[in-house]
Every structure is written in structure tokens, then in C-alpha cells.
Regions:
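Extracellular attachment/recognition segments
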Residues: 1-156
Length: 156
């Protein structure tokens, strides 16, 4: 499942289940500001231009699993953590105990010029977590970032 969007320099797409995005821009540029779960069954991705109007396409990619599978029922847990407001915010969301990390995302709560995602990364350590970071570029725009961890477990 792929959804495409175009909206005068600021893109926002919401649809059921997803785990990735790509901003296809030309000219001045358009960068990602969000890719995160809204509910256990829906995802949102956003991008924006930076000081110069730069319309672009935003593609959001879906990877899905059925709720009922042969070995049981898939239960989803979404956890989130907010950063402090800063020019280069970072946050780490921990997976709920008893769940396996399957993905994550982030939403930047930017103010005027924008603060853009540069890091969406699952943990490589024993602590199951998902890290996110963003930064302002050229023009100061201290922002808050919310990191999300998406976990699942199979219940019989």
C-alpha cells in the first residue's frame, strides 16, 4: 500500500498501517517532519519546505500484519516520549515490557521555520527502544520531538 500527497510545500498523509516514508522533492527542498503511529491501526507522515516554497510528493509505505494469525492474536503497544524544547531535540521511547520492538517513529512539533527529522533509529542494545532526533536549519526554531516505539506480542 502506497499513498502519495502533494500540497503547496507542506505535505501530510494519514492512512491505515504504515512504517516508512519518502519525500520526493526537487528545487529548494522539502524535508520530513513526522512519521508516527496515530493508533495501533493508522500512521501519519508529514514534510515541509524551508523558507522557499517547494511543493513535493510524499510517499508513505505500509507493512501490515493481520490481527488474528495462526498462532494467536497480535496485540500492539505504542509508547511515546517527549523531548525538551531545543534547537536539536532528541527523544527515546522504550517498548512496553513484554512486547517486541517492531518499529517506531517521531513527530516534530515545530513552530515557525521548521525543525526537520534526521534520525529515526531502533536500538541495537538489549533495551528495546526507538530513538528520534531533529534539528533546525539556517533559521532558529527550537522545537519538541515526540519519539514513538511500536511493540507487538502474540496472545493465545
Amino acid at each position: 500500500m502506497i499513498a502519495d500527497g502533494l500540497k503547496y510545500g507542506y505535505n501530510s498523509i494519514t492512512f491505515d498501517s504504515s512504517l516508512g516514508f519518502r519525500v520526493d522533492w526537487h528545487g529548494a527542498g522539502n524535508l520530513g517532519t513526522a512519521s508516527f503511529p496515530i493508533t495501533e491501526f493508522s500512521w501519519k507522515a508529514c514534510s515541509k519546505d524551508h523558507s522557499i516554497s517547494a511543493p513535493s510528493n510524499l510517499q508513505v509505505f505500509a507493512i501490515c500484519i493481520k490481527k488474528k494469525i495462526a498462532v494467536g492474536t497480535v496485540t500492539v503497544a505504542i509508547t511515546k516520549t517527549d523531548s525538551n524544547q531545543t534547537p536539536h531535540p532528541e527523544a527515546v521511547a522504550l517498548v512496553k515490557p513484554g512486547f517486541a520492538l517492531v518499529g517506531g517513529g517521531a513527530e516534530v512539533h515545530w513552530n515557525e521555520w521548521g525543525n526537520f527529522l534526521w534520525k529515526l533509529e531502533p536500538s541495537t542494545s538489549q533495551a528495546q527502544s526507538f530513538s528520534a532526533a531533529s534539528k533546525d536549519v539556517i533559521y532558529p526554531d527550537p522545537s519538541i520531538i515526540t519519539a514513538y516505539a511500536l511493540g507487538i506480542r502474540i496472545d493465545e
